[in-house]
A protein has these predicted regions:
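Conserved short histidine dyad/triad with adjacent acidic residue
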Residues: 40-59, 95
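Short, conserved beta-strand element in jelly-roll/cupin
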Residues: 58-73
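Short acidic-glycine-tyrosine-enriched beta hairpin
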Residues: 78-95
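A short hydrophobic beta-strand segment most commonly corresponding to one strand
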Residues: 92, 100, 104-113
Length: 113
């Protein structure tokens, strides 16, 4: 929990990575880590990171800002054009979207969900 009136360096925050479920992995051996920093009026704020590889996910309702790294996000359900993301990208995801993340450089994002 990040107490009010304090700050954290999101780029340097240590994260404990774990392998993604084999059923989600399309290629490579990606790992991911999340740390929740707290909630604001019931909305979680945190940092998430994924190492290179390709994996599918069922999304939560969230907005995120990419801090570092690069990836392509393919929208499988609903079918939408893929997007390329990198430092400074701001992306909106909706609950239930099915995505495929192809991370080419370890991707770290700050999310609000």
């Amino acid at each position: 929990m990040l107490p009010a009136g304090t700050g954290v360096d999101a780029a340097a925050l240590p994260l404990a990575h774990a392998p993604l479920p084999a059923s989600d992995v399309v290629s490579g051996s990606p790992t991911a880590a999340t740390v929740a920093l707290g909630e604001i009026r019931g909305v979680e704020v945190g940092v998430w990171e994924m190492t290179p590889g390709t994996a599918c996910d069922r999304e939560a309702d969230e907005v995120f800002v990419v801090m570092s790294g690069r990836a392509r996000i393919a929208f499988l359900e609903p079918a939408l054009p893929s997007i390329e993301v990198g430092p400074g990208s701001i992306v909106r995801l909706a609950e239930g979207m099915r995505t495929e993340w192809t991370v080419t450089e370890t991707l770290r994002k700050v999310y609000v969900a």
